[in-house]
Amino acid sequence: DAALWQSLAKNTEPAAGKAADMLFPDRPSKRDDFYSELCSKRSRGLARVWTLEREGNIICTVGAYALANGQAYMACGETVEALRGKGVGGRLIVEMANALAAEGWMPVFLCSPERVDFYTRLGFEKMGEYARYEVQ
């Protein structure tokens, strides 16, 4: 929806704390870890995060949280509940992927299995699967 998109401001250098708050509002430990890691990586040019904002509030975010070996590992695509399904998040993801590709990075999106169809509709191709292991 063009009117919705025009009401939003894209920020390619949002405050790390605001992005962390949006992604992990109820998980302070995870939020603090994310904030610390993002600040450290961005200061060395190893990560980027973009947001869409309305009236100063983040309504959507996506990031490339590891830039290495010619690949940009994208993750944390998140849109506020009220605007999901309106194409806002998908458009931001595609814009960031295209910008990274124009700079010579190969965008790679890591996602949970239930989100594969969403990213395939955006033009991503499933290349493989990763497993995550946690120490118990």
For the regions a language model picked out, list residue spans one by one.
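Short amphipathic alpha-helix that is part of the acyltransferase structural core
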Residues: 1-40
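Acyl-donor-binding surface of acyltransferase catalytic domains
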Residues: 1-7, 111, 131-135
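A conserved beta-strand-loop-helix scaffold within acyl/acetyltransferase catalytic domains
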Residues: 27-78
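Short acidic/polar active-site loop segments enriched in Thr and Asp
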Residues: 70, 105-106, 125
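Conserved acetyl-CoA-binding loop-helix of GNAT-fold acetyltransferases
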Residues: 75, 79, 85-102, 121
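Conserved active-site alpha-helix within GNAT-family acetyltransferase domains
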Residues: 90, 113-130, 136
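Conserved GNAT acetyl-CoA-binding A-motif
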Residues: 100-112
